[in-house]
């Protein structure tokens, strides 16, 4: 899959693959509290296009931003970084 220009990429863990050609990933990030200066983990779920249905639950994947593919899908899977055990 070719990348057109610079697109945002994120890394996440697959939490659901029950839909056809669609997976749901959970991406975490660290956020610093403005007053207490403590880092906390925030997470968000994204629906991602998986053209070949090759992801399993627990896989770590890298996804890139793309054009809107449906009402909720704006991300496309680039590659699987680590397989689930």
From Swiss-Prot:
Keyword Hydrolase: no
Keywords: Ribonucleoprotein, Ribosomal protein, RNA-binding, rRNA-binding
CDD domains: Ribosomal_uS17
Assigned GO CC terms: cytosolic small ribosomal subunit
Gene3D superfamilies named among the record's database cross-references: Nucleic acid-binding proteins (2.40.50.140)
Protein's GO biological process: translation
InterPro entries referenced in this protein's UniProt entry, alphabetically: NA-bd_OB-fold, Ribosomal_uS17, Ribosomal_uS17_bact/chlr, Ribosomal_uS17_CS
UniProt record similarity statement: Belongs to the universal ribosomal protein uS17 family.
Name listed for the protein in its UniProt record: Small ribosomal subunit protein uS17
Annotated source species: Syntrophus aciditrophicus (strain SB)
